[in-house]
Structures are given as C-alpha cells and as structure tokens.
C-alpha cells in the first residue's frame, strides 16, 4: 500500500501516536503535509460556495454526508483546500469527526485533542483561525442534525 494511502486511512489515534513520536515541529509539519497529499481531491462540482468554509485564509471546502438514524445520524465528511498544510489540517479534522454520530460530534472539542498533540501552538494565527472555522462548522452542523 502506498505511504500516502496508509496515512489517509490512519485513525485519529494513529495520527496522535505519530505526533507524539515526532517530537520536532518540522517533522510534524512534514507529516501534516503528507496527510494532506494523501487526502483525495474533492470533485470540482463539490467546490461550491455552500461547501466553502468561511473564516479560512486559504480556500477550504467541506461536504457533509449522513446515514442511519435521522434523529442522530452518522456523519462523514469530504474536504479539500488549495494549500498543502491546510489540506493536512483538513485530513486531521476529517479523521477526528468522520464516522461518528451527530450527538458525539457536537460534543467533541477537537481543540482539546489538537492542543494535547501540540498542533495548535505551532500554527500561525491565520491557520489556527481556519482550523477553528472548520471545527465550528462541523460541530454546528452536527448540533442541527442531532436536534432534528
């Protein structure tokens, strides 16, 4: 299996373990870029204004899919960005939230996890704000769907 595919398929636990193992920020930065390279490209027809995440300096798109119980659906996400490091951040956000019930997503504070692994403090303020915008959008969607 190509290295990039393994990275994309990595669970959040694997990403956390890899971050802990990589104690140098430069190595972590390269790892985030590798995660982004492994992220499947979002189809052009999904790069719409409705899917664009506001508050990101780079262009970021998130697409939400739901399945299962309409009162607490399982949510999965597709995403993409026009910037390498941000694509990696998208991959981490997707690993954090995809495949979980809406109620769990709404309650999950990804920034607690991101801080624990040393991700947030090493990002520029623009990237950190963009990451917050992605997380906020996903959690808000989950709150609406969990309440439906």
Swiss-Prot record:
Coiled-coil residue windows: none
Taxonomy, superkingdom: Bacteria
SUPFAM superfamilies (alphabetical): SufE/NifU
InterPro entries linked to this entry: Fe-S_metab-assoc_dom (IPR003808)
Gene3D superfamilies: 3.90.1010.10
Family: Belongs to the SufE family.
Name of the molecule in the record: Uncharacterized SufE-like protein RHE_CH01250
Annotated source species: Rhizobium etli (strain ATCC 51251 / DSM 11541 / JCM 21823 / NBRC 15573 / CFN 42)
């Amino acid at each position: 299996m190509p290295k990039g595919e393994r990275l994309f398929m990595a669970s959040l636990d694997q990403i956390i373990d890899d971050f802990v193992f990589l104690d140098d920020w430069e190595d972590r930065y390269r790892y985030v870029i590798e995660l982004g390279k492994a992220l499947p490209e979002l189809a052009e027809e999904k790069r719409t204004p409705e899917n664009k995440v506001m508050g990101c300096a780079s262009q970021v798109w998130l697409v939400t899919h739901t399945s299962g119980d309409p009162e607490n659906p399982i949510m999965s996400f597709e995403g993409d960005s026009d910037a390498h490091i941000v694509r990696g951040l998208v991959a981490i956000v997707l690993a954090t939230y995809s495949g979980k019930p809406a109620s769990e997503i709404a309650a999950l504070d990804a920034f607690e996890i991101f801080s624990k692994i040393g991700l947030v403090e090493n990002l520029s303020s623009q990237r950190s704000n963009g990451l917050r915008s992605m997380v906020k959008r996903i959690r808000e969607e989950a709150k609406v769907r969990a309440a439906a």
